[in-house]
Swiss-Prot record:
This is Coiled-coil domain-containing protein 172. InterPro entries: CCDC172 (IPR029618). One of its GO terms (cellular component) is sperm midpiece. The gene is CCDC172. The lineage of its organism: Eukaryota, Metazoa, Chordata, Craniata, Vertebrata. The keyword Coiled coil applies. Keywords: Cell projection, Coiled coil, Cytoplasm. May interact with TEKT2.
Length: 258
């Protein structure tokens, strides 16, 4: 081998060695990058694992909470069913008590009405209550007018105005209530008037009974005869006797009707 060939071989060998060292550096650099990637991937994996474990824990907690909610929902449904049944029982009891109270109230009102009719105090009480209601209505109207005047003079004060308006509304409501009561009393008064008219008709009927009496008819016939004969004095005497007889019979019929 010549010296030149040896020199070229040495240069080629050094070149290969340099190439090998370059490749080694690239391999080491690549290994370092791969290790960094592996480390980063491992860290990310650990983070994801921690997140996953946290999510799993949250899932178990939510599952447990959901079971608790379902158990609570079942308990509430059971309680609602019990409350509904109890409410239905209470409603039935209330309806029965309400019906009994209405019956007792009707019975009491009937007894009071019978008592008032027996002792003739209903009409007096109604008249007195009617007068009282009218007086109260008049007082309330006066108070309402006074409040209206006060409200006009106190419009600058909002709080006082609102209070007066509230009082006015209450007074108007009470006035409507009393007017309804007055209407009830007027209806009762009309009923009493109808009863009075009926009694007056009975009285007229009783007063007409003497027309069917034999003695009364006889005297009337005599009266007609005397009237035809222009016997005025006898006619007047018989007329007086007939009126006295009618009055006596009417009083007798009234005593019998009592």
């Amino acid at each position: 081998m010549s010296l030149e060939s040896l020199f070229q071989h040495i240069i080629f060998t050094e070149h290969q060695a340099e190439e090998s060292r370059r490749l080694m550096r690239e391999v080491r650099s690549e290994i370092t990058r791969c290790r960094e990637k592996i480390k980063k991937a491992t860290e990310e994996l650990n983070e994801e694992k921690i997140k996953l474990e946290s999510k799993v824990q949250q899932f178990f907690e939510k599952s447990f909470f959901l079971q608790l909610l379902k158990a609570h929902e079942n308990a509430l449904e059971k309680q609602y069913s019990e409350i509904t049944n109890h409410r239905n029982m209470l409603l039935q009891t209330f309806e029965a008590i309400k019906k009994q109270m209405i019956e007792e109230e009707d019975k009491f009102i009937k007894e009071i009405t019978d008592f008032n009719n027996d002792y003739e105090i209903t009409k007096k009480r109604e008249l007195l209550m009617k007068e009282n209601v009218k007086i109260e209505i008049s007082d309330l109207e006066n108070q309402a007018n006074m409040l209206k005047s006060e409200m006009k003079s106190m419009e600058h004060d909002s709080s006082q105005l609102n209070e007066l308006q509230k009082q006015k509304s209450e007074l108007i409501q009470e006035l409507f209530t009393l007017q309804r009561k007055l209407k009830v009393f007027e209806d009762e008064e009309n009923e009493s008037i109808c009863t009075t008219k009926y009694l007056e008709a009975e009285k007229i009927k009783i007063s007409e009974k003497p027309q069917n009496d034999t003695e009364c008819l006889r005297l009337k016939k005599e009266l007609e005869l005397y009237k035809e004969d222009d016997m005025e004095s006898v006619y007047e005497a018989l007329q007086t006797e007939i009126e006295f007889l009618e009055l006596t019979l009417a009083q007798k019929d009234l005593q019998e009707s009592k």
